[in-house]
Design a protein with these regions (language model features):
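P-loop (Walker A) phosphate-binding loop of NTP-binding proteins
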Residues: 39
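Conserved phosphate-donor/acceptor-positioning beta-strand/loop module used by diverse small-molecule
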Residues: 123-143
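Small-molecule kinase domains that catalyze NTP-dependent phosphoryl transfer to phosphate-bearing small molecules
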Residues: 149-196, 205
Length: 205
């Protein structure tokens, strides 16, 4: 039986996952859930690092959740589905406890983002979506550099080839006009300051 086949199992795993997180002492009222969407090498980790310096946010990491789930995932093809299920339930539990969070992961599907928004707002939180903008060629150049670092053992990670990069780009559903979002432009310090200011205004309402 897989993680998604037993809701009780998911509840227990989400509680265990919350205990693995670094929870900030300070709190935003109401709590917020910051969700990201962008193609590979768009600067997600850089943005997460800077936003956690500016705001009290617990970080949900795709990489850490994959490690957490590794012994339990029923088969490889369900990995992404199970990571999303665990992340959604974990976000719910954090918001219920008044803990703000950021998901260090590109939530590619609009329906998944809509579901997170629905759950966050149902528990009294605020949903903030950030679109990470980057030129495709620039992103692939950066990705190639990261791949080289991984192959030389200078960085941990998985090498993403051109075909997989193109698949990720094609399958990423960017926010539509009906899906309000903030915009972060990779490599633009002023864009980072703007996003921080915008989140400050949202959390002050």
């Amino acid at each position: 039986m897989g993680l998604l086949d037993d809701p009780r199992n998911l509840e227990i795993l989400a509680e265990d996952n919350v205990r693995t997180l670094k929870i900030p002492n300070a709190k935003l009222t109401p709590p917020v859930a910051v969700i990201l969407v962008g193609i590979p090498a768009a600067g997600k980790s850089y943005l997460v690092e800077n936003l956690t310096r500016a705001f009290p946010l617990a970080v949900l990491s795709e990489e850490e959740m994959l490690k957490f789930l590794a012994p339990r995932i029923s088969f490889f093809e369900r990995a992404q589905e199970e990571i999303f299920a665990l992340s959604l339930k974990t976000i719910e539990k954090l918001i219920q406890r008044g803990i703000s969070c950021i998901f260090d992961y590109s939530v590619k599907k609009r329906e998944d983002r809509a579901l997170i928004k629905q759950r966050v707002e149902a528990y009294g939180g605020k949903f903030i979506l950030i679109h990470l903008q980057v030129d495709k060629e620039e992103a692939y150049k950066k990705l190639s550099q990261l791949n080289n670092e991984v192959s030389r053992g200078e960085r941990k990670g998985v090498i993403m080839n051109k075909d997989l990069f193109e698949y990720e780009v094609a399958s990423t559903m960017l926010p539509s006009s009906a899906e309000p979002s903030l915009t972060f432009r990779s490599g633009d310090p002023e864009s980072l300051r703007t996003v921080v200011d915008q989140i400050s205004r949202i959390t002050a309402r």
